[in-house]
Amino acid sequence: MCFRTAGAATGSATEREAPPSVPDKRSKLGLLMLDCLIIGGGPAGLTASIYLARYRRAAVLIDDGASRAARIPASHNYPGFKGIAGPDLLARLREQALLYGAKLEHGRVTTLQPWPQGGFRAQWNGKDIAARTVLIATGLIDESPKVEGLVSGVYDGAVRFCPICDGFEAMDRRIGVLGSTDEAGRKALFLRTYSRHVMLFGKEEMSEAMRVSLNQAGIGCAGKAIRVECPKDGVRVTVQGGDCFDLDVLYPALGCQVRSELATGLGAACTETGNVIVDAHQRTSVAYLYAAGDIVSDLHQLAVATGHAAIATTTIHNSLGRNPR
């Protein structure tokens, strides 16, 4: 039996075999067979929970509380808000999901395996759960170097991660970028869009071409940062040798780790950087396994994550067959 799945944006349709059906939604071992298990409680996962609840699907979201969005001091390009802090946005999404009866659980999924009867079986907090489909929205983790004071600076709001989200608000201010790779150089060049006063801390691993580009853009390069302090209304960076630099905002560019181990454990195809490869409907290379958000895209934007979730859950809903009231 085949069902048609909704197009990502154009209304196109793709046929794919429907997930295995269990008449009473219970497996032979007595586990509740969900329509969908959502792993990850960031913007993508919570949006998915809202959609599936409104589609009247049996779904559970399991979140370990590690959403990167919780570290955003303020995002100014999320539609509908002049500026909203990451924790506030997550709280609003949770409230909206619960309004429609969504099931939200705190915990960490440690194993995810194919289910003999079809679908998947997962373990979390010592419990078992089974689902016909799974949506992974576990995001990524930013690398944190051993720089004194850097982590506390994140919570003070002077250390930020997303220049697309708040670079505009740093217009003509003193901006620092922390990192020694070409990726850090690209972030510094992007921030040059907003200010002439951009300083890069560390360039040990940069290519010669990147060094030339930074010089042509008028971006200064200082030594390796060893300490970050956040006095009132700013940030101070101390480098090896003792020199200090007073800035208004600092952006780390130290790389990140995609949390795709659950997907790769099932054999899902990934890029060299660990991002899960999906089609236009957020389907991975593993049948009935979907992915959304930062785990998929290197454009780490809240709006992108919520869009992924809307596409994935509509495809999931259509693939499961009708659920008349």
What would you call each of these model-derived segments?
Residues 152-169, 254-304, 311-314, 318:
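FAD-site-proximal beta/loop scaffold in flavoenzymes
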Residues 91-92, 97-123, 129-131, 193-275, ...:
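A Rossmann-like FAD-binding core segment of flavoenzymes
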Residues 157-164, 174-187, 208:
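Active-site glycine-rich loop that binds ribose-phosphate moieties when present
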Residues 2-8, 13-34, 91:
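Extreme N-terminal leader/targeting segments of oxidoreductases
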Residues 2, 25-36, 104-173, 238, ...:
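FAD-binding core/adjacent interface of flavoenzyme oxidoreductases
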Residues 54, 197-203, 304-325:
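Internal hydrophobic alpha-helix adjacent to the cofactor/substrate pocket in enzyme cavities
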Residues 34-88, 179-205:
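Beta1-alpha1 glycine-rich phosphate/pyrophosphate-binding loop at the start
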